[in-house]
Amino acid sequence: MLKDITLGQYFPGSTIIHRLDPRTKLIGLVCYIVALFLAKSYVSYALMALVLITLSALAHIRPKTLLSGLKPLIFIVIFTGIINLFYGTGEPLVQFWIFKITANGIRNAVFMVLRIMLLVCGTFLLTYTTSPLQLTDGLEKLFSPLKAIRFPVPELAMMMSIALRFIPTLIEETDKIMSAQKARGASFDTGKLKERAKALVPLLVPLFVSAFRRADELATAMECRCYHAGEGRTRMKELHFAARDAVALVFCALVIAAVSVLRHYGL
């Protein structure tokens, strides 16, 4: 299951989605999330799913690849859906003890599950098509107005980028430690839930040691390359908006407008 966690991975490519300015993709993700929270009908969620499928096709990312990243989140998705299932109003369809299932509760549960799945897949699509360096530059440019109040924008952007990039690294390290302990007789897949949780405790110490070691090595490497954030730092490739970015932003605005219209008319 650890290998199914794909957040933070980057798949190089030359598609139109890969070539978009990272600021455009970040703004697009925000617009997509806003549209998801505006969606209140099956038609709206179908539209948002169609948008995601279209973008993944343009990026040459198979829907199967996007959905594979949801496997580690299945428990959270199901739990959230069940919680929303019992908090609907209206005439109960099924009732037992203090719990009741209504048509509105089923609708809310389906919408919540769809919202989480589409939101996570949209975030995956951003990381799949944007390198950590591009994300750092994009975040720094977007947050640059905060420099007026002496906010450490470059440091924040670098910190977020490194954190995102370290996710697959830590997952790989965890998988190696688990394999080494399994070779010594440890079991992580058998027994009751409490026993499985206890079996994971011995993983924490070597994982933290590995994480701190990697962080120290990264800091040393950055210092050796004379890295410094803030004013005076240059880039090999400066960010520039192109015509395709304008088209993408217009498309984002149209998606929000379409979902807003569907919400207004109850479709």
What does each model-found stretch correspond to?
Residues 1-44, 48-57, 144, 148-151, ...:
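Transmembrane alpha-helix interface motif
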Residues 73-186:
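Juxtamembrane/interface alpha-helical elements of multi-pass membrane proteins
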Residues 41, 45, 60-64, 88-96, ...:
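Transmembrane helix-loop junctions in multipass membrane proteins, especially transporters and channels
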Residues 25, 64-74, 245-248:
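Alpha-helical transmembrane segments and their helix-start/interface "positive-inside/aromatic belt" motifs
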Residues 14, 37, 60-65, 96, ...:
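Membrane-helix interfacial "entry" motifs
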Residues 51-61, 75-79:
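Alpha-helical transmembrane segments and their membrane-interface exit regions
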